[in-house]
């Protein structure tokens, strides 16, 4: 083991200078008893064993615990609804971003057409004064008519799909009415044809 005899402190630029270091050899040093690392007091292991004791809860901790247990069903319900609605919300946001991008790079003549279609809706609303059914039918009808003038191919596809859906709904309604008719009015028909009424 080397022992440094001369120390020098100076600026960092002077650290590149060379100088001599005098050290004593192992033969000159007196023999010392070596100490193992685990014998040092720094590394000594305490002999007593510690035991974990949980501190008693305070009133604030108890009230927070009760509040968490009370709110847990509601938070789990909210998380479930959020996970169910997250894809729908993301698709709605994506649709909004796509619409915004389309409106930023709109084809020529799009905004005048949109203005005419909107004006047709306002005219339908003005002509529908008085009746609630007219207010529900006239504005979309006028807007649909104006849109079909500018976009005839899309209007044809829309009418075909809407016609099929309306036919299906009408057929379902007819079946429901027929079932109700058979249940309610055939029973009363049997009373008229009973032998006591002849």
From Swiss-Prot:
Glycans are attached at residue 162. O-glycosylation; glycosaminoglycan of chondroitin-sulfate type. Residues 1-25 form the signal peptide. GO terms for cellular component: endoplasmic reticulum membrane; extracellular region; Golgi membrane; high-density lipoprotein particle; low-density lipoprotein particle; MICOS complex; mitochondrial inner membrane; very-low-density lipoprotein particle. It holds the Pfam family ApoO. It is found in: Mitochondrion inner membrane; Secreted; Mitochondrion; Endoplasmic reticulum membrane. The keyword Transmembrane applies. One of its GO terms (biological process) is lipid transport. It is a single-pass membrane protein. Keywords: Endoplasmic reticulum, Glycoprotein, Golgi apparatus, HDL, LDL, Lipid transport, Membrane, Mitochondrion, Mitochondrion inner membrane, Proteoglycan, Secreted, Signal, Transmembrane, Transmembrane helix, Transport, VLDL. The keyword Endoplasmic reticulum applies. Belongs to the apolipoprotein O/MICOS complex subunit Mic27 family. Component of the MICOS complex, a large protein complex of the mitochondrial inner membrane that plays crucial roles in the maintenance of crista junctions, inner membrane architecture, and formation of contact sites to the outer membrane. Plays a crucial role in crista junction formation and mitochondrial function. Can induce cardiac lipotoxicity by enhancing mitochondrial respiration and fatty acid metabolism in cardiac myoblasts. Promotes cholesterol efflux from macrophage cells. Detected in HDL, LDL and VLDL. This is MICOS complex subunit MIC26. It comes from Bos taurus (Bovine). The lineage of its organism: Eukaryota, Metazoa, Chordata, Craniata, Vertebrata. The gene is APOO.
